[in-house]
Amino acid sequence: MITLGITGRSGCGKSTVTAVFAAHGVPLVDADQISREILLPGSPLLPVLARRFGADILYADGSLNRRLLADRAFAAPEGKAALDSLVLPEIIRRVCRLKQAAREAGASLFVIDGAVIVGTDAEKECDHLCVVTAPFATSVARIAARDGIAPEMAARRLNAQTPEEVLLARADLVLRNDADLASLEAAAAVLCEQLQAEGARKGGADTSL
C-alpha cells in the first residue's frame, strides 16, 4: 500500500484534489477534521489545554473557545509549540489507526489530507507528498469569497502560513492549480490512478508499518 500526503496552502484547491481521490474509491483521512473532533466537548484534551492556556478557554458548557485558544497559542512561538505537543500526538494516533485499517482491508492507496503535514510526524507516515499550488492572487480571491472577508485579510492569513517554497522543497509530487477546475481534476485523476497502480504492485495487504 502507498500512503500519499496531500497538502497545500489555503485556497490552493486541495479539497478539489482530495475529492477526486475519494471518487476513485481511495480511503482517506482528513487530519484537519480530526484536529477539530479531538477538541469537542468531553475530550480529555480540553482540561489539559485549560491548565496550559487558562481555564477561560472553556465556555461554561465545557466547549472550547477556539478563537481565544488560538490567540494565546499564537501569541508566542512557545505557545504554538506547546499546543502542537498536546494535540499532534493524538492526531497521529488516529491517522495511524485508520491507515492500518485501510492496509488490512487491502487498499492499494491511502491518503492523508492535511494543511499541516510538513514538519510533523504525519509526514513520516507518507511514502509520497503531493503539494497543491495556486497563484497567490487566486488563493486570496478564493479565501475571501469562501470566508466572506476582505481580500486584505485573506492575504494576511495566507502570508501567515508555511511559505509555498518550503512545502515544494519537501514534495516529490506537485499539482499546479493555475488553469481551470477541469484541468486540476484531470491531473489529480491521472496521479491517483498512477499511485493506485504503484500501490497494487507493492501489495495492499502488507501488515507491516
Predicted regions located by residue number:
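Walker A/P-loop
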Residues: 15
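Small-molecule kinase domains that catalyze NTP-dependent phosphoryl transfer to phosphate-bearing small molecules
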Residues: 94-98, 124-125, 145, 149-201, ...
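Hydrophobic anchor at the beta1->P-loop junction of P-loop NTPases
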Residues: 6
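P-loop (Walker A) phosphate-binding loop of NTP-binding proteins
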Residues: 9, 21
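ATP-dependent NMP and nucleoside kinases share a basic, alpha-helical "lid"
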Residues: 96-105, 109-145
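ATP-dependent small-molecule kinase phosphotransfer cores
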Residues: 33-108
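ATP-binding Walker
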Residues: 12
